[in-house]
Amino acid sequence: MASKALAIIAGVGPGTGASIARKFAQTYSVVLLSRNPSNYEPLVQEINSTGGQAVGISTDVSDANSVNAAFDQIAKQFPSSALAAAIFNPGGGFVRKPFLDLTEDDYSSALKSQANGGFNIAKRALPLLLQAKDSIPHPPTLIFTGATASFKGSANFASFASAKFALRALAQSLAREFGPQGIHVSHAIIDGVIDIPRTKAWKFEHEDAKLNPDAIADSYWHLHTQPRTTFAFELDLRPYVEKW
């Protein structure tokens, strides 16, 4: 029997990353990357106990050596599995400060976690996606998670917006380079507050004013399953009452 194809989710916590992992684990083996093993260990156990296959690897996406070690481990554990999808979803680099209070470390840390992290994951994932394009039912896919800050540099968000703008530019360049080679590179703008454990207590005037992480995961799966005739580069997701 042929080995099950693989999806890699970089940036897994109890919210959106977990929802993406559960969605893709319905079809693929999944590898979950996060710096803190406590972010993925319960999810790995959950997926494996319900008939899926998941492994977690402690990885700092901003560190090329850490990413290389993770991909080397993936190659050893899944030597004959094609890479169907890679999702870049780290939440690092979020700082809200007046510009004059920002430190150089604040600024560089945001760029490292988002721009450098996206570069490091793409550098290792794209060769595998290119190898897989003739052996899986859907186009090999690389999705980057963006934010409101990907297209709007708001006051007090100079470091995060700079990092997210850079990540979006990387995604667009890769889409133009690798799309003609059959790889679907996409950037998803998550424009609003996501309904995750740390935002549960946040109250809003309107019902359903927070993004549902399971619905975000459904949208990512939709991107992955789009045919080559109909690639979407960018997808905006926001609650119906979100001003934009």
For the regions a protein language model found, what residue spans apply to each?
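The beta1-alpha1 cofactor-binding region of Rossmann-like NAD(H)/NADP(H)-dependent oxidoreductases
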Residues: 38, 58-72, 104
